[in-house]
Amino acid sequence: MRKIVHVDMDAFYASVEQRDDPGLRGKPVVVAWRGARSVVCAASYEARTFGIRSAMPAVRAERLCPNAIFVPPDFVRYKAVSRQVREIFHRHTDLVEPLSLDEAYLDVTQAKTGMQLATEIAQLIRTQIREETELTASAGIAPNKFLAKIASDWRKPDGQFVIAPSRIDAFLLPLKVNRIPGVGKVMDGKLAALGIVTVADLRLRPLEELQAHFGSFGQSLYRRARGIDERPVEPDQDVQSVSSEDTFSEDLALDALDTHILRLAEKTWLATRRTERIGRTVVLKLKTSNFRILTRSCTPEQPPVSQEALAQIALALTRRVELPAQTRYRLVGVGLSGFSNVEEGAVQGQLFGEIPQAE
């Protein structure tokens, strides 16, 4: 039986800002650029009490909390702290799979330290993070990645939760299906329309029925309802692509997608900055109302050097969609692929918006 730990830093970007500026502590902090098309990168727990969440439009966050303190993101600083945290992970196991700067899976089945109890390993990791970075992290401990990720949310912030193999059914069955990763508002609504509200409801449905309604995702739902997840922890995978998607509550015409594409381009650009790598190929993904998936891509001579350039290329790709004008779309996505490392110096400054200081 594997021992998997999912570690998730608490309000990471906002917590770094509060750590480094004592004047921000105890106040609603929103990490975001101001602007009509900006989205929230992170919100402190004080800001979350007003309903502010990551990926929310910044203008909405400002309406929810007019007194919120907006801080522009500093990904160079966040990356440096992330390296500190990752070094702590590697003291315990080489099987570390980063998901982003602020979370990772660890397989501690055979920990380097010789410690046997995954709960004790997780506690020690969280203690080391607190002592060495002055930040807090939460952890979930379980026999697989799916369960560990759910568990890490259970005692946030600054806590941990274990799902023992003997307790999987007792934990899973009462859960609302929207706690399953990948089940968002739209999917939750579709499941509810079928009378599926809890994981217990989901488990009663045969695989064939779920596949008929949800295609390949139906198989994933079937397995997750049984707590099954055989995916291994894959150490330090290089990023091959970054993308953001929106699924709509109502199907939209192609010409109604522009505002969504602009917002998704910003989310994708922010995610790309976190990797400190260059994506050369722009990808537009569409799903029609009858679940047909289309992708269009473009690899310009020079990679997009700004969020605006990425957005313009993605918008241009909509003109390469050759479907009847009456076609309606239920999903749009914007992505970057074909990654390479950012050059040091001037190129990095050009790509990631750093303005050289006059000497």
From Swiss-Prot:
PROSITE patterns per the UniProt record, alphabetical:
UMUC
Supply one GO molecular-function term: damaged DNA binding
- According to its UniProt record, the EC number is 2.7.7.7
Identify the residues that bind Mg(2+): D8, D102
Q: Spell out the reaction equation it catalyses.
A: DNA(n) + a 2'-deoxyribonucleoside 5'-triphosphate = DNA(n+1) + diphosphate
Domain UmuC: where?
A: 4-184
Report which superkingdom the organism of origin falls in. Bacteria
**Marked site: Substrate discrimination:** Y13
State the compartments where it is located: Cytoplasm
Q: Which GO terms describe its biological process?
A: DNA-templated DNA replication; error-prone translesion synthesis; SOS response
Could you say which cofactors this protein requires?
Answer: Mg(2+)
GO cellular component assignments = cytosol
Q: Report the cofactor remark.
A: Binds 2 magnesium ions per subunit.
Q: Where along the chain is the active site annotated?
A: E103
Name the CDD domains for this protein: PolY_Pol_IV_kappa
Provide the alphabetized UniProt keywords. Cytoplasm, DNA damage, DNA repair, DNA replication, DNA-binding, DNA-directed DNA polymerase, Magnesium, Metal-binding, Mutator protein, Nucleotidyltransferase, Transferase
Family statement: Belongs to the DNA polymerase type-Y family.
What role is this protein assigned? Poorly processive, error-prone DNA polymerase involved in untargeted mutagenesis. Copies undamaged DNA at stalled replication forks, which arise in vivo from mismatched or misaligned primer ends. These misaligned primers can be extended by PolIV. Exhibits no 3'-5' exonuclease (proofreading) activity. May be involved in translesional synthesis, in conjunction with the beta clamp from PolIII.
- Give the quaternary structure: Monomer.
Q: What is this protein called?
A: DNA polymerase IV
Query: Which organism is the protein's source?
Result: Xanthomonas oryzae pv. oryzae (strain MAFF 311018)
